[in-house]
């Protein structure tokens, strides 16, 4: 990094009280994908991955937004996991093409899927039995994050609320489509995107 970027980093850390461990968690999350492709992690590892690649970013962001410490940490916890689980459900086939499978091992076994080859898992007829409870877990995290945002100022939660509404729309489309193969990609319509921005960013 240049001297100026380093100075800006130090100034931001001091101004907003950003935590060094959150920056390191983000790096750790990226490194989880590097040494070997993730395939059917256990639930604890999946949750750790979600924390590192999503919630850690949230913990840094909420301090900049000006949320109270406790609510900010809880919002980062729940919204980060909601967004990342939605990403996992949306990108099942794309990830499989890269040799990755983020669906939890315990739930695959419970559904009778013992193979961890991404291509075979994503074609398995029992896959919806794994994806449906994961979608419910994402919905729970969305609900918890909504409760936190409701009790904080509209200005402080503007950015996280927009992200929440957009990703919740994706999750709803995924649930409506279902998770059996073949899975058509889902996209939030332009009208829906504009509606979210008008309601939560402008009005």
Regions found by a protein language model. Name each.
Residues 3-84, 89, 93-203:
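Catalytic cores of Mg2+-dependent Asp-rich isoprenoid enzymes
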């Amino acid at each position: 990094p240049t001297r100026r970027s380093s100075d800006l980093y130090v100034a931001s850390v001091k101004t907003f009280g950003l935590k060094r461990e959150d920056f390191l968690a983000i790096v750790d999350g990226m490194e989880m994908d590097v040494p070997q492709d993730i395939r059917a992690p256990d639930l604890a590892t999946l949750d750790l991955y979600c924390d590192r690649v999503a919630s850690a970013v949230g913990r840094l962001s909420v301090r900049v937004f000006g949320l109270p410490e406790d609510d900010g940490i809880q919002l980062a916890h729940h919204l980060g996991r909601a967004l990342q689980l939605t990403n996992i459900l949306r990108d099942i086939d794309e990830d499989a093409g890269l040799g990755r499978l983020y669906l939890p091992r315990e739930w695959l076994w419970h559904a009778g899927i013992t193979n961890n080859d991404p291509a075979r898992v994503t074609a398995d007829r029992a896959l919806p039995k794994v994806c449906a409870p994961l979608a419910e877990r994402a919905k729970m995290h969305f609900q918890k994050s909504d409760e936190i945002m409701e009790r904080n100022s509209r200005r402080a939660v503007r950015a996280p609320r927009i992200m929440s509404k957009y990703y919740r729309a994706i999750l709803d489309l995924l649930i409506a489509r279902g998770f059996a193969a073949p899975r058509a990609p889902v996209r939030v319509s332009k009208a829906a995107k504009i509606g979210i921005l008008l309601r939560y960013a402008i009005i």
